[in-house]
Structures are given as structure tokens and as C-alpha cells.
């Protein structure tokens, strides 16, 4: 399996675009991209044909640092304003199963499955997969 450190490898904008590209392939959807700067809680968005709103937010954080719970709580407030049907959080860093559970609980009801919390290990797994349309 690949073992890229996305925090050190990519600049914030590059990581956001990379995350969007990976999620588009994984989910087989087209995500709208937005300009740099304050994003009101969404780095990318898809409105499905049946009107569902899927939001993707990417966070480029170092593995060495503590998980930024304060920042995640602020993102949850933004999600509460948007009220997406589904929220996909892409992290450049890895998390423990307990941290993933707490993130999912924090973002309830928007994060609908553990797969909606994509970590650095997950991203490396997608890159190492032979299945181009990974889902």
C-alpha cells in the first residue's frame, strides 16, 4: 500500500483538489469546486438529480498534531446551517477507531457512515487500488 504523507506532500489547495478528485471517483459523482478562502463549511458540493445535497470538506492536518476538535465543532456549526443530506469529511491525517466514532457522533445526522470520514490511510488505499472506479 502507498504511504504518502499528504500534509507534507500537498499545499492546502492541492489537498482540497486531490480530495475532491478522489471522492468524485469513489462516489461516481461530480462535485462543484469553489474559490479559495472562506467556504461556509464546504470545499465541494454535489446536488444529486433527486435534489440531495452532498457536501465534502477537506482538512489538511499533520499526523503529529492532536486532532483539532475545536475546529471540527466549528465545521459542525457550519454543517448545521447548510443542512446537507450527506457530509463527507476528508482528513490528510489518520485517526483511531474511537476518534472516527466521535467525529461521526459530532456530525450526526450528516455523516451517515464511517466511510464518510476519509483518512490519510484511506486515501493511500485508494491510490494503491487497481480498481480505478473504487467504491
Q: Model-predicted segments: where are they?
A:
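Mixed-charge (Asp/Glu-Lys/Arg
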Residues: 1-135
Amino acid at each position: 500500500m502507498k504511504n504518502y504523507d499528504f500534509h507534507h506532500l500537498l499545499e492546502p489547495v492541492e489537498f482540497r483538489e486531490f480530495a475532491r478528485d478522489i471522492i468524485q471517483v469513489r462516489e461516481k459523482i461530480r462535485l462543484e469546486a469553489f474559490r479559495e478562502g472562506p467556504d461556509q463549511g464546504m470545499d465541494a458540493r454535489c446536488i444529486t438529480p433527486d435534489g440531495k445535497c452532498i457536501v465534502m470538506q477537506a482538512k489538511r492536518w499533520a499526523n503529529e498534531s492532536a486532532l483539532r476538535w475545536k475546529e471540527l465543532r466549528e465545521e459542525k456549526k457550519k454543517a448545521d446551517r447548510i443542512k446537507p443530506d450527506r457530509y463527507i469529511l476528508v482528513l490528510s491525517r489518520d485517526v483511531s477507531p474511537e476518534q472516527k466514532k466521535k467525529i461521526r457522533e459530532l456530525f450526526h445526522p450528516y455523516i451517515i457512515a464511517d466511510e464518510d470520514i476519509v483518512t490519510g490511510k484511506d486515501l493511500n488505499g485508494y491510490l494503491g487500488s487497481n480498481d480505478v472506479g473504487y467504491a
